[in-house]
Curated annotation (Swiss-Prot):
GO terms for biological process: 1-deoxy-D-xylulose 5-phosphate biosynthetic process; isopentenyl diphosphate biosynthetic process, methylerythritol 4-phosphate pathway; terpenoid biosynthetic process; thiamine biosynthetic process. The gene is dxs. Catalyzes the acyloin condensation reaction between C atoms 2 and 3 of pyruvate and glyceraldehyde 3-phosphate to yield 1-deoxy-D-xylulose-5-phosphate (DXP). Belongs to the transketolase family. DXPS subfamily. Keywords: Isoprene biosynthesis, Magnesium, Metal-binding, Thiamine biosynthesis, Thiamine pyrophosphate, Transferase. Mg(2+) binds at D152, N181. Homodimer. Pfam families: DXP_synthase_N, Transket_pyr, Transketolase_C. InterPro entries: Dxylulose-5-P_synthase (IPR005477), THDP-binding (IPR029061), Transketo_C/PFOR_II (IPR009014), Transketolase-like_Pyr-bd (IPR005475), Transketolase_BS (IPR020826), Transketolase_C (IPR033248), Transketolase_CS (IPR049557). Thiamine diphosphate binds at H80, G121, H122, S123, G153, A154, N181, Y288, E370. This is 1-deoxy-D-xylulose-5-phosphate synthase. Disulfide bonds: none annotated. CDD domains: TPP_DXS, TPP_PYR_DXS_TK_like. One of its GO terms (cellular component) is cytosol.
Amino acid sequence: MSLDISQFPVLAQANTPNELRQLPQALLPQVADELREFLLKSVGISSGHFASGLGTVELTVALHYVYNTPFDRLIWDVGHQAYPHKILTGRRDKMHTIRQKDGLHPFPWREESEYDTFSVGHSGTSISAALAMAIAAEKEQAGRKVVAVIGDGAMTGGMVFEAMNHAGDLHNDMLVVLNDNEMSISENVGALNNHLAQLMSGRFYTTLREGGKKVLKGMPVIKEMAKRTEEHLKGMVVPGTLFEELGFNYIGPIDGHDVDALVETMRNMRNLKGPQVLHIMTKKGRGYEPAEKDPIGWHAVPKFDPSLFKKPATKPGLPTFSQVFGKWLCDIAEQDEKVLAITPAMREGSGMVEFSQRFPKQYFDAAIAEQHAVTLSAGFACEGFKPVVAIYSTFLQRAYDQLIHDVALQQLPVLFAIDRGGIVGADGPTHQGAFDLSFMRCIPNMVIMAPSDENECRQMLYTGYCYDAGPSAVRYPRGCATGATQVEAMTALPIGKGVIKRVGKRIAILNFGTLLASALTAAESLDATVVDMRFVKPLDVDLVKEMAQTHEVLVTVEENAIMGGAGAGVLEQLQKLRMPKAVLQIGLPDEFIKHGSPEEVTHDLQLDAEGILAQINAYLAQ
């Protein structure tokens, strides 16, 4: 259900940036107010990322008003904050479909709009892409401008500084907008700083500055004195030393909710030469009191009624796998003070809030720096501690070299608790945990476990904790657990051993992970044997051999890419054993998995009980 645009009379006149730029600047504050109200009501209908977008309304209006998008390139880092951008770029009437099957993509996406110049979803990529586009613009001599928008959280990633260091060296024309919502608008980020930013980005100041450089070129002592005087003057009100050292001209900080100040400053900066940083201060959740007070809790929301000023109460139900992990982590930390938990800025999502509060000296948030987080854990392991890295499957990809070089190569006992393995649903292809079994399985010294339910997850975590011959990984999905009876006592499982769950004939289903219930349901119709393999690596070779000897067809089931996944491991073992056998591999196809609810995606990929049965019957009919 789309919103009635007649409720937003000024916003109705700005369905595209071209239409926005036709409006008088005096109307921009009203555009921003109506855009914020539209966003509020739209996300209430659709669900989605919420607080970040509320904080970037004025910035989005100013960017599209000053810059000639899409000719000028605008790149959003991560993309949580880009909902206002989607609304202003011709997608207003489809906002109620965002993150839903066949609806708008959750992040900026090149295939969706010409205004989305770079597809995003992970943090820290915007400045590298913007630099490349700035270099291309200079080569084409088309007069194209390039802007990257990045949040203060993403600035903790090393890739950001690699890109800024390179950009400062090359000195191409580009603008980086640092959207700083870490603190509220303080007194010094008001009229004085807004005025100073406009002054220092204005033509008179920059002409005087560049002309002075030429005059003083032959007088190095005086030139150095002038440079230091300017730096001291700026340093009185400007916290930009780091950016200046990287070769960027720094302007700010200014109020990111003053659309007129943003427009005037950007107009001045649009024609500045070289790399520029505009530092703006914003407030996450701006304009909606509950989100302002709790921006983390309102980062992403289900469907809700904005007039109630609260999110819908969650119905009591099964714990999530993240909560199962969080409870296990607290339980094991009570027994062992050498347990250290590391996460790259995923405390809430990984179920670590209670642990961080109860065991603050054993908790390390490495920020959005996955490479650092993994090598930090390696260092802890070297010193005899028991590091546990809680990380999403999709983000572990970013630390692959560290996993190999710093952990596995040294056979260090680091336990990886890999959340969001498999289908995550609405966040789409940038966040599906499709590849972890494949990219870990080829690493020597790794033990990889895939629990079928929450009790097995708890026992596997304990198994990884006890294992000291190298790294281990427990890989579990997003969402609620299965309802299995949880055993509080923790027992280490025998490494590399599976369990037969159902005895049948002719067909043996070898299941890896939480698709076990669906596999068992499908097996009832087929009278098939079902095995909970538990270990992806080392594989239970004896059990695979037994199943191959006693059944005509083997079926492997996993919520991972078929290529290189657990099923591929079964085929490799059969080949090694010289046992030719009909094997059907069921898993994720060789494509990036689109967004939709987990149930919809699972059904479309034929990974539910009905789909597994259909795939097996189709294979048998060949």
